[in-house]
């Protein structure tokens, strides 16, 4: 595993409501966490990050909104008994959504570019329209057209989403995201992985305006582990990992020091993986 390929926080700094999104097309917009055990998941993330969970009631299938210090992080959905298009059980996992201007048009564009539609465009009451696709590399990605809900809120405090990245064996995925999401992919130069091989990184937007990254992970990770990853900020790596273990989670890789924070890949008790980033423990580039 290498360090993340981007800045310490995504570019979007927004409010959560409004008739028109303040996010640019292709920037990170929303997160969904799928689980088969809501109570255990709430206990785990509440203990690790101090998150609050708001049950939306029977009309929304008891989905939850996730908040950190009152600021929106994303949504929680119980997928027990649900299956995907191939009939397989839906796994517990974190899903990333990118902001778009027209869910129908962008989904059609994605199909033309080789994507498969997993969930066709649909309205989520007045909050917005969403769709879920599988890009040509096999990675799932959500599309969010904002209505009254703009997206998650970046606060810069521990518990906030701080970075998103697509880990892939197919670096040519960049062409898909440029065509479908108007991504402005900027090379970060070639780094080195732990084996001493070159690693190719890009970010959507340059420098501090970057909203997510794309990393060539061939030779770093098995192909079946590829996909989108989300990073959450923590104040202390040591304290966060102690909470992860105590509450039934596991450490998958790291910690790894980087200029963007101390990064550790972990999994919750349902084996949904994510990364924690202690931005205050960042190392100096040299």
PLM ranges: what are they?
Residues 1-23, 284-286:
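Actinobacteria-biased recognition of intrinsically disordered, low-complexity terminal regions
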Residues 119, 150-154, 184-185:
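Short helix-to-loop capping/linker segments positioned immediately adjacent to catalytic or ligand/cofactor-binding
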Residues 12-16, 22-25, 29-71, 112, ...:
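Core segments of cupin and vicinal oxygen chelate
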Residues 24-26, 89-92, 125, 157-160, ...:
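Short glycine-enriched loop/turn motifs at secondary-structure junctions
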Residues 28-32, 45, 51, 91-100, ...:
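Short, structured motif recognition centered on aromatic/hydrophobic residues
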Residues 146-168:
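Solvent-exposed, charged amphipathic helical/linker segments at domain boundaries
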Residues 36-39, 67-72, 96-136, 170-171, ...:
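Vicinal oxygen chelate
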Residues 2-6, 51-89, 136, 140-147, ...:
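Conserved short beta-strand elements that form part of the metal-binding/catalytic scaffold
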């Amino acid at each position: 595993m290498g360090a993340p390929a981007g800045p310490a926080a995504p570019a979007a700094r927004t409010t959560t409501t409004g008739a028109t999104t303040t996010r640019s097309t292709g920037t990170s917009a929303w997160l969904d966490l799928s689980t088969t055990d809501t109570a255990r998941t709430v206990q785990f993330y509440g203990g690790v990050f101090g998150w609050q969970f708001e049950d939306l009631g029977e009309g929304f299938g008891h989905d939850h909104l996730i908040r950190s210090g009152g600021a929106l992080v994303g949504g929680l959905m119980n997928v027990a008994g649900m299956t995907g298009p191939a009939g397989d059980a839906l796994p517990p996992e974190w899903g990333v959504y990118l902001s778009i201007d027209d869910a129908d048009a962008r989904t059609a564009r994605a199909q033309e570019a080789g994507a498969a539609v997993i969930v066709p465009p649909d309205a989520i009451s007045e909050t917005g329209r969403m769709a879920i696709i599988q890009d040509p590399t096999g990675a799932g990605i959500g599309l969010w057209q904002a209505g009254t809900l703009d997206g998650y809120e970046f606060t810069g405090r521990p518990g906030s989403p701080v970075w998103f990245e697509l880990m892939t064996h197919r670096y040519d995925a960049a062409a898909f995201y440029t065509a479908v999401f108007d991504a402005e992919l900027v090379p970060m130069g070639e780094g080195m992985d732990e084996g001493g091989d070159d690693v190719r990184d890009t970010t959507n937007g340059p420098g501090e305006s970057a909203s997510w990254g794309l990393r060539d992970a061939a030779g770093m990770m098995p192909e079946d582990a590829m996909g989108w990853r989300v990073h959450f900020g923590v104040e202390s790596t040591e304290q966060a990992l102690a909470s992860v273990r105590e509450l039934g989670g596991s450490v998958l890789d790291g910690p790894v020091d980087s200029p963007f924070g101390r990064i550790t890949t972990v999994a919750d008790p349902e084996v949904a993986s994510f990364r924690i980033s202690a931005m205050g423990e960042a190392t100096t580039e040299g």
